[in-house]
């Protein structure tokens, strides 16, 4: 059919250009349509059902099947994603995978991968995938993933039986792009595209990170620099070692988080579910319950050599929303930094002068801490003794709504005190979308500029159209 169409086109080569263009479009459509049909026919794998049990999503392929089966699991934070290569002992079948060290290596964005498809190191592409730490997958493959990703991406591996090695089954996880980051502290000094937590710090100095947490919040901590074989990761410590399963309550008391915050949940779950690699053993996530009733202070720390980064979490129940004040945050952090910096100024060999100054500074710091403790106690008493009624709450909401509505309608309402870089990943944003950028915004290109590759400069645009106009006159005059 294609040959006849081409002969017909050659025979009428002298016809008007419009008809020639129509033939070309028609032929391209026919070829593309048949090509898509062939691709869909080749990729017609049998999609397996997903079984959900509690917090586990399970998908099973039968390695003894004569038809190629495909398991697809969509990323959902808090879910354990479990792939199973089902074997039949009666046939003495052994399950195999490709790549052999899946999930450390996998195929990325391959619709129908084969053994010859290019494979990549999973961690270098997407560090937020918590997988098994096995060199070889026997019959199961379990993983967690964080909800943050700066790209749409899918990872896949092949699963097959040694008695049926010509039929390759596919295990695939789909991860959707989202800009929203997790409330937490990243002490790994990571670039924005590899950071899924809102606050970025470095373990090149002593630092603290204070988080106010509420019901249903997801909190995270990370100590690891997400680069393979980076010297930053030498001598790292996460304390307590299984944070957030255990947390510091007070200065040095370690308690289980389920006892301190009932109905909370830690991701990853205990190592019996997922065997963590070293890359992921310095990260943890805490899911707070939807009925948080306690106002408490807990913490975990990251340590690198002599530098310590402390994550301090203040949990707040629903009553605390009426009195939440970010200024308390700054006071507590400032006291911490003042105490550290003042002690750092003195040397141990300065004798009596050193002791005199140190005592003076310690008294000053203790007075500050005493004042802060009194302020915190008054704050808690205010929360515990308050008796809310419907009118008070309605008045509070109405006042804050009016303030919000006034800001929303004001000329400068887009300017806020919150740093947008602490909430979203702007690593791939263009400068024209950045309201706080000092650079001149890029003009939007027109359809014709994109079509012909023309410059956005008005002078070059005029010259190009002039040349095009002269060329058209020459064509139609011949």
Swiss-Prot record:
Propeptide position ranges: 456-478
Q: Name one Pfam family in it.
A: s48_45
Keyword Protein transport listed? The answer is no
Q: Which coarse location class describes where this protein primarily resides?
A: other
Q: PROSITE patterns, per this entry?
A: 6_CYS
The SS bond pairs are: 59-71, 85-159, 102-157, 185-209, 223-302, 243-300
Q: Which residues are glycosylated?
A: 109, 138, 229, 279, 291
The 6-Cys domain, residue ranges: 42-178, 181-326
Which membrane topology describes this protein? Answer: Lipid-anchor; GPI-anchor
Asked if the record carries the keyword Disulfide bond, the reply is yes
Q: Any idea where this protein resides?
A: Cell surface; Cell membrane
Q: Where is the lipid attached (GPI-anchor amidated serine)?
A: 455
Q: Which GO terms describe its cellular component?
A: cell surface; plasma membrane; side of membrane
Keyword field: Cell membrane, Disulfide bond, Glycoprotein, GPI-anchor, Lipoprotein, Malaria, Membrane, Repeat, Signal
Q: How is loss of this gene reflected in the phenotype of the organism?
A: Attenuated parasites that cannot commit to infection, even when they encounter with hepatocytes, resulting in continuous traversal of hepatocytes.
Check the record and name the InterPro entries matching this protein: 6_CYS_dom, 6_CYS_dom_sf, Parasite_Repro/Invasion_Surf
Q: Which residues form the signal peptide?
A: 1-41
Biological role stated in the UniProt entry = Involved in sporozoite infection of hepatocytes and replication therein.
What this protein is called in its record is: Sporozoite surface protein P36p
| Organism expressing this protein natively | Plasmodium falciparum (isolate 3D7)
């Amino acid at each position: 059919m294609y040959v006849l169409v081409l002969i017909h086109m050659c025979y009428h080569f002298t016809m008007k250009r419009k008809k020639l263009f129509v033939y070309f479009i028609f032929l391209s459509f026919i070829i593309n349509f048949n090509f898509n049909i062939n691709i869909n026919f080749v990729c017609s794998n049998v999609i397996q059902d997903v079984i959900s049990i509690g917090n586990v999503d399970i998908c099973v392929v039968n390695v003894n099947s004569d038809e190629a089966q495909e398991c697809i699991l969509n990323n959902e934070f808090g879910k354990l994603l479990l792939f199973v290569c089902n074997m039949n002992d009666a046939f003495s079948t052994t399950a195999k995978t490709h790549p052999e060290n899946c999930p450390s290596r996998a195929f990325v964005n391959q619709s129908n991968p084969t053994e010859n498809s290019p494979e990549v190191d999973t961690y270098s592409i997407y560090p937020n995938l918590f997988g098994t730490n096995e060199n070889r997958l026997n019959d199961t493959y379990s993983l967690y993933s964080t909800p943050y990703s700066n790209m749409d991406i899918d990872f896949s591996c092949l699963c097959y039986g040694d008695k049926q090695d010509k039929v390759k089954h596919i295990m695939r996880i789909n991860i959707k792009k989202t800009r929203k980051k997790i409330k937490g502290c990243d002490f790994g000094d990571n670039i924005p595209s590899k950071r899924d937590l809102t606050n970025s710090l470095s373990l090149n100095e002593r630092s603290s990170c204070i988080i106010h947490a509420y019901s249903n919040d997801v909190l995270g901590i990370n100590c690891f620099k997400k680069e393979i074989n980076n010297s930053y990761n030498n001598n790292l410590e996460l304390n307590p070692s299984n944070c957030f399963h255990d947390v510091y309550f007070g200065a040095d008391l370690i308690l289980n988080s389920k006892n301190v915050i009932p109905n909370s949940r830690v991701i990853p779950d205990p190592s019996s579910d997922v065997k963590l690699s070293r890359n992921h053993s310095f990260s943890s996530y805490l899911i707070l319950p939807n009925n948080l009733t306690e106002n408490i202070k807990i913490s975990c720390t990251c340590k690198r050599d002599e530098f310590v980064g402390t994550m301090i979490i203040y949990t707040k129940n629903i009553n605390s929303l009426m009195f939440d004040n970010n200024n308390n945050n700054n006071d507590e952090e400032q006291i911490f930094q003042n105490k550290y910096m003042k002690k750092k100024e003195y040397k141990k060999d300065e004798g009596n002068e050193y002791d005199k100054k140190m005592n003076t500074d310690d008294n000053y710091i203790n007075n500050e801490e005493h004042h802060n403790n009194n302020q915190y106690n008054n704050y808690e008493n205010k929360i515990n003794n308050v008796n809310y009624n419907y009118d008070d709450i309605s008045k509070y909401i109405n006042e804050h709504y009016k303030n919000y509505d006034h800001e929303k309608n004001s000329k400068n309402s887009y300017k806020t005190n919150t740093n947008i870089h602490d909430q979203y990943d702007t690593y791939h944003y263009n400068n024209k979308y950045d309201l706080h950028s000092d650079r001149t915004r890029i003009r939007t290109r027109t359809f014709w500029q994109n079509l012909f590759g023309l410059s956005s400069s008005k002078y070059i645009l005029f010259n190009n159209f002039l040349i095009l106009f002269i060329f058209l006159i020459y064509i139609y005059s011949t």
